């Protein structure tokens, strides 16, 4: 049975906007896990997130898997709106602007990872989430923007068999690894992609390649009930 709340227009608007901004903050925290594990090593962000999802009912399992940044037309817009309101009401703090800065910075860090492999870049998944065509607020486009700022053109949703490229799996897809040219690098944001070829590199974002946990994780796919 759906829960129905009766209230004023102002309460209704606040419910909608704070719902979206809360989810933005939660996604930012989840993605911070992979930013940290990318640097400290010996850690798989999916393992950490899975524990948080299941060990504490306060955290909850939805929107708690590190991956691409928060996106869509509503969440960024509502964060910007509440940032403006926080300033207008002289609250003295602005969590909402910080969430937007985190979103931007996480996209820039991901662009650095793609560029570091020294190959042409393709992003698989242009829309802001799987199963839709809408690109408003797409985190993939934000990553592509930072790549372009640093002098690297990005292609979308096409596997080129003729040259080695770095592919970002922005959506949880599983292309046949025979499609990739020799020497290609696959950066998987969801840490679920496995391949059988020795002449391509699969990089689980947030897991350092030299760590033993990286090898173990590749042979024990994570579970996700989100």
Roles of regions detected by a PLM:
Residues 1-226:
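Structural/interface elements that position substrates and couple domains in central-metabolism enzymes
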């Amino acid at each position: 049975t759906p829960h129905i709340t009766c209230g004023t227009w102002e309460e209704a608007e606040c419910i909608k906007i704070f719902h979206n901004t809360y989810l933005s903050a939660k996604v930012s925290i989840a993605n911070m896990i992979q930013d940290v594990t990318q640097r400290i090593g010996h850690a798989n962000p999916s393992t950490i997130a899975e524990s948080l999802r299941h060990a504490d009912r306060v955290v909850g399992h939805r929107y708690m898997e590190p991956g691409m940044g928060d996106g869509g037309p509503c969440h960024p817009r509502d964060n910007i709106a509440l940032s403006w309101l926080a300033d207008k009401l002289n609250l003295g703090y602005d969590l909402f602007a910080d969430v937007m800065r985190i979103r931007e910075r996480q996209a820039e860090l991901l662009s650095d990872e793609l560029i570091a492999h020294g190959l042409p870049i393709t992003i698989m998944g242009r829309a802001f989430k799987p199963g839709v065509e809408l690109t408003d607020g797409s985190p993939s486009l934000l990553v592509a923007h930072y790549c372009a700022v640093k002098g690297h053109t990005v292609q979308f949703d096409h596997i080129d068999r003729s040259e080695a490229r770095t592919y970002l799996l922005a959506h949880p897809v599983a292309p046949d690894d025979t499609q990739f040219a020799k020497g290609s690098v696959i950066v998987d944001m969801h840490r679920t992609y496995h391949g059988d070829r020795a002449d391509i590199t699969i990089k689980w974002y947030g897991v350092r390649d030299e760590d033993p946990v990286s090898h173990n994780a590749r042979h024990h796919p994570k579970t996700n009930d989100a």
